[in-house]
């Protein structure tokens, strides 16, 4: 890729992985595949329902790709929660990815949002109608404080996606805008709060740790994502409203300076994450560490981020950063490179077609009279 700062990216990635002491040992291969298939299967059946198919209006290939990406993220990162919780979170976060990739103007469907919310009516916006229907399945896993974070952060995410519809990177001199938008659409509080299901953590007992984790995760999670996404977004016309690009516009700096700004903030956040929780409740630290390592594995292994292209490009180079990056990449691939054919079946489109055929058969069944039923 022309002009992509490969050497800088390698150095940054290596420092990040060293800071978090990357060593993903969350699962055996069998456990990983089992959890992937369980979460995928439940989520696929959810999105194959006629109501979801009709209201989402998403290209089947895009929906399939989105679901596989999100199931991977949840299973790899939320390694401590139950399989049922993984499945319900996979559905919720797939909805968010579908919205993130949407180009529909939300304004008309949001005119009566609060009135409908207050009156308990179904939302006019189809995304909100479906997300609200599924929310009880998600919230049943969490206490009230964590649940509030999930609800509020999801609302922020919707607003962030609304802003992004305008492809507005901020005005020059508006230094607060890039981080404002990234926090809005980053789902950091939703992610940070969903690590603590009530079957594993009493949120009253661990309230201080959970609150601190939500605060720290807000930046760490989105900054790592921005860093690991930088390659795939570098020349993608659809991804020009990124944090790095918005730094360039608002801070009036070069792309290299913007990338360095993101790098320093990500590395500082990584140091903080480890330092703050290293002497806290071991179960809390273990949960955070498993999330960080799994989250990195997911980025390195998921085809969406195309980091295998970087690996192929530099695997024969003799620089220290290239060798370290390749070692980390191979380490991630050894545990996380699982072909979708091993777990992502059946396809959502296949399930939807089966449901549609069943509905047609049901509609053509003869209607029995009351006399025939008695006989």
Swiss-Prot record:
Assigned EC number: 4.2.3.6
Pfam families found in the cross-reference section: TRI5
Reaction equations catalysed: (2E,6E)-farnesyl diphosphate = trichodiene + diphosphate
Disulfide bonds: none
Biological-process GO terms, alphabetical: sesquiterpenoid biosynthetic process
InterPro entries associated with the record: Isoprenoid_synthase_dom_sf, TRI5_ascomyc, Trichodiene_synth
GO molecular function terms noted in the UniProt entry: trichodiene synthase activity
Keywords on record: Lyase
Enzyme class: lyase
Domain of life: Eukaryota
Pathway the protein contributes to: Sesquiterpene biosynthesis; trichothecene biosynthesis
Keyword set includes Methyltransferase: no
Additional record remark: Trichothecenes are sesquiterpenoid toxins that act by inhibiting protein biosynthesis.
Role noted for this protein: TS is a member of the terpene cyclase group of enzymes. It catalyzes the isomerization and cyclization of farnesyl pyro-phosphate to form trichodiene, the first cyclic intermediate in the biosynthetic pathway for trichothecenes. It serves to branch trichothecene biosynthesis from the isoprenoid pathway.
Similarity-based family: Belongs to the trichodiene synthase family.
Identification of the protein by name: Trichodiene synthase
Organism whose genome encodes this protein: Fusarium acaciae-mearnsii
Gene: TRI5
């Amino acid at each position: 890729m022309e002009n992509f700062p490969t050497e800088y990216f390698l150095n940054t990635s290596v420092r990040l992985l060293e800071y978090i002491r990357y060593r993903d040992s969350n699962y055996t291969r069998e456990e990983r595949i089992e959890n992937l298939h369980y979460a995928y299967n439940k989520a696929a059946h959810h999105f194959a329902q006629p109501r979801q198919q009709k209201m989402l209006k998403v290209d089947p290939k895009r929906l399939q790709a989105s679901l596989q990406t999100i199931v991977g993220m949840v299973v790899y990162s939320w390694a401590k929660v139950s399989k049922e919780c993984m499945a319900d979170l996979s559905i919720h976060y797939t909805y968010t990815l579908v919205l993130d990739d949407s180009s529909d103007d939300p304004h008309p469907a949001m005119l009566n949002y609060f009135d409908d919310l207050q009156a308990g009516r179904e939302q006019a916006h189809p995304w909100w109608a479906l997300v609200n229907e599924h929310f009880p399945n998600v919230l049943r896993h969490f206490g009230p404080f964590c649940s509030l974070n999930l609800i509020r952060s999801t609302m922020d995410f919707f607003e962030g996606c609304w802003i992004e519809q305008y492809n507005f990177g901020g005005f020059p001199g508006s230094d607060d805008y890039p981080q404002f938008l990234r926090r809005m659409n980053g789902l950091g509080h939703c992610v940070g709060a969903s690590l603590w299901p009530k079957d594993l953590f009493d949120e009253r007992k661990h309230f201080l740790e959970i609150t601190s984790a939500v605060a720290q995760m807000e930046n760490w999670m989105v900054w790592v994502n921005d860093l690991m996404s930088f390659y795939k977004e570098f020349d993608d016309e659809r991804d020009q409203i990124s944090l790095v690009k918005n730094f360039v516009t608002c801070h009036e700096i070069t792309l290299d300076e913007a990338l360095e700004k993101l790098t320093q903030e990500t590395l500082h956040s990584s140091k903080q994450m480890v330092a703050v929780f290293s002497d806290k409740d071991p179960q809390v630290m273990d949960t955070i560490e498993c999330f960080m390592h799994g989250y990195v594995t997911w980025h390195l292994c998921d085809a969406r981020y195309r980091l295998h292209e970087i690996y192929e490009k530099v695997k024969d180079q003799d620089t220290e950063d290239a060798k370290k990056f390749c070692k980390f990449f191979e380490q991630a691939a050894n545990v996380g490179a699982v072909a979708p054919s091993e777990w992502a079946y059946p396809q959502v489109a296949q399930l939807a077609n089966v449901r549609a055929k069943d509905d047609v058969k049901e509609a053509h069944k003869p209607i029995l009279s009351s006399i025939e039923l008695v006989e």
